Amino acid sequence: MTERDSSPEADKNGLADVVEETGMAGFLGHLVELRNRLLKGVLAVLVLFLILFPFRNELFTMLADPLSRHMPAGSTMIAVEVASPFFIPLKLTALTAVFIAIPFLLYQLWAFIAPGLYKHERKLVAPLVFSSTILFYLGAAFAYFVVFPVVFGFLSTAGPSDVNFAPDIGEYLSFVTSLFFAFGFVFEVPVAIVLLVIVGVVTPDKLAGFRRYAILIAFIIAAILTPPDVLSQFMMALPIIMLYEFGLFVSRFFYKAKLARAAEVEAEESGAADDESDEAVSARHAEYEAKAQTQADEPLDMDKAFDEAEADQRRLESDSSASDDGPESNTAGRTEEGEQPSTGSKPEDEPNAPSEPSPKKPDSPV
């Protein structure tokens, strides 16, 4: 028995052979590609974090500006927990790094899925990714420059006069972060509508008929994503409704382009069928003639098979008659003049007659 080579190179070659034989090379290649894309995204966020870390306090001051401008004179934000003055700016720096790196992260996602798409799909996805990024930043900017001043101006004066308004920095960061991402994703409504129309899930006419329900859903989404105050709910619901109408308007152009492309494909297919009609007819005729010739030759083979089966049946019946009559009847049959033992075979001129043993003739007088 030969010893198995247990060296690392042999194990590596053996694993490569197994991967190649089992067809897992493509799957492992996708996993390696996904790992590389994720590492690039993490490295990009880490580099941005290191660049922004020295400015962590300035970032928090800029983020707190919409609230600071509406706070009563002499009021400041507080830190309830001991480590909050250090960890809250650190957390804000990490979130800012992710926020800035969104275009690069989307590009890595696009680079991973693009090789598996058709050419027309790649032409469609690239503008959608670009528009999604722009709309996300527009939603965040809308929250910072429009929603925050209105909401904080209302909340700072809505409480009792004898209550000191001093928000916690941790709660404030959670509040504004949720609004940032909520408005960023809400501004993706036009992209979602266009995708649904392109895929064929809905049509622009159906979306127009669904308008009243869309308004109700907009207020429900705003109630879920925003803090529990009516003003911020309206501040989110109204943009959702406007973006729904904008997406409906844009989707009509994509729907018309989709119908035109489908008509062109159908026309090309019908034109190709017309151009090749003569050749197709000739090919069909030749195919039918070959089939007819084959069917004409088949009965000869069938007759031969039937004759062979009939011969086998006669042999089986002869053996069965010999075993039933016994040796005495066979001897008596051989001593009769001009008499042969009955084999029960069918007449040759009646191939389709049922196979039954022919009756014995009466003994001739001596």
Swiss-Prot record:
Location (main, coarse): membrane
Composition-biased stretches (Acidic residues): 266-279
Gene Ontology terms: biological process: intracellular protein transmembrane transport; protein transport by the Tat complex
Keyword terms, alphabetized: Cell inner membrane, Cell membrane, Membrane, Protein transport, Translocation, Transmembrane, Transmembrane helix, Transport
Biased composition, class Basic and acidic residues, residue ranges: 281-290, 301-318
Subcellular location(s) of the protein: Cell inner membrane
UniProt region (Disordered), positions on chain: 266-366
Pfam families (UniProt xref): TatC
Extent of Polar residues compositional bias: 319-333
Any one annotated GO CC term: TAT protein transport complex
A molecular function (GO) term: proton motive force dependent protein transmembrane transporter activity
TM regions (residue ranges): 42-62, 70-90, 97-117, 134-154, 179-199, 207-227, 230-250
Membrane topology: Multi-pass membrane protein
Superkingdom of the source species: Bacteria
Self-association state and partner proteins as the record states: The Tat system comprises two distinct complexes: a TatABC complex, containing multiple copies of TatA, TatB and TatC subunits, and a separate TatA complex, containing only TatA subunits. Substrates initially bind to the TatABC complex, which probably triggers association of the separate TatA complex to form the active translocon.
Annotated function: Part of the twin-arginine translocation (Tat) system that transports large folded proteins containing a characteristic twin-arginine motif in their signal peptide across membranes. Together with TatB, TatC is part of a receptor directly interacting with Tat signal peptides.
Protein family per UniProt: Belongs to the TatC family.
Protein name as annotated: Sec-independent protein translocase protein TatC
Lineage, opening ranks: Bacteria, Pseudomonadati, Pseudomonadota, Gammaproteobacteria, Chromatiales
